[in-house]
Amino acid sequence: VKRSKIGFGFVALAAAGALALSGCASGGGSNGGGDAGAGIITVNNTEPQKGLIPADTTEVGGGKVVDALWEGLVYYDADGVTQMGVAESIESDDNITWTVNLRDDAVFSDGTPVLAHNFVDAWNYAANIDNAMGNQYFFSAIKGFSETEPVEALEGLKVIDDHTFTIEATPDFPDRLGYSAYYPLPDVAFEDMEAFGQSPIGNGLYKLDGEGAWKHDESISLVKNDTYVGPREVSNEGIDFKVYASLDAAYTDLLAGNLDVLDQIPDTSFAVFEDELGDRAINQAGALTTTLAISTSLPHFGMDEEGKLRRAALSMAVDREEIIDVIFEGTNVPAVDFTSPVVDGFADDLAGKEKLEFNLDEAKKLWAEADAISPFEGTVEVATNSDGPHQVWIEAVANQWATNLGISAAPKLYPTFAAFLDDREADVVGGPFRAGWQGDYPGAYNYMQPLYYTGASSNHGFYANPAFDAKLDEAINAASHEERNEKLNEAQEILLEDMPSIPLWYQGTTGGYSEGVDNVVFGWNSVPIFNEITKN
């Protein structure tokens, strides 16, 4: 008897859940940029690092836009429940081979139908190493995937008919299907993928507002997609994503009524935003984690005895509680692991978690032991981007390291998030760097595989440990949910031994909205559910 693994009400985590944005559509007006027109909501954003290709978008500036332009097989609602999107059903009788049946009324915004081959072609393209997609690793669970050799067509994907295809993959694979890497692509995308990324055609709740809708470093203007037919509805006429050089500037615009929704409060306003915004302030639990990653190629910080001693010393020299109380006004929670408390399987008793606790004497001792192996000279520079809300706490961490370890430590600031990411990917940052993570889909695996698996695209510390990789592989092939969580926790204990990054805190979701909008709800991943927002 077939049983549906993915269906209405399936929850992938303990208390969370929405990554895709939502809506149903009727015709939208025109708003080619600049001031938003009637019914258009304005939202803060950062400039996307790359073109708007779902399988190549790995940061939130592009991710928010991609999720508004597309709809996947499923989506996660604001409470973490998996709901059907383009899929009518996803069924398996063995947890290995999945049959996907699509709705027959789904279309792209250019009017072409969304068919089974649009998913299969998009996935094959993303999985092929020759295409260098940032989310390639999300297809590693499908039979036939290769990390090293180009594969034109995955053995585990088969088109049955226009509205049916099958997937042969690991048992946990369906949990991820709401993530943007799995969105379909229209045939036209493959004619010139780079050009497509600048003017994408999706099948979601919104579409680009005509030619020139993406004004680089300024704004991205979307309107309701009048071709969308699906389970969700849009309560506004569109979204104007406004690119800001700093969150302070965005917050000032919010207070002045020049911005409708701000999805992150700057650290300089934590003490006052709830008083200034009143019941329009958002302060809730989230699934964002903040860490400091350290490249394994950085002298004195490699994956040898000296490097592990220094990594542990830096971690134990940070007084997380003090920074959270003074800078974040208590809105964050000190980290005790590498995932998030809102995901299923979270454990706060992992072996090695003492490395995440403030212990000044032990930190000094470990640093001295490392110096006995190879003396450290120079300055520990801790890096972040200055167009985000991080400069103040980065300075606090540097000051604590200097005071507590008696070393030279200082911030290193990049002007933009894109420039910061470029240097991380090129392995030229030259010191510890901020490496926060927002869940792509509701699951603990997603907080480890993209960041720490050998060769993963967001593994900007270039960590490689075959034992850790093997534990993750065991987890995704586990026969039961309980066994999967057990293997994931064992993998975390390897991370706590090696410390490829320094977990700092679980970031609360703080935001706000203007008097010009209503029905503002933030999902589990701290992204507003844009389609539900109404313009007054």
Name each model feature, range by range:
Residues 44-94, 201:
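N-terminal lobe/hinge region of extracytoplasmic solute-binding protein
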Residues 115-124, 162-168, 205, 236-238, ...:
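Alpha-helical secondary-structure segments
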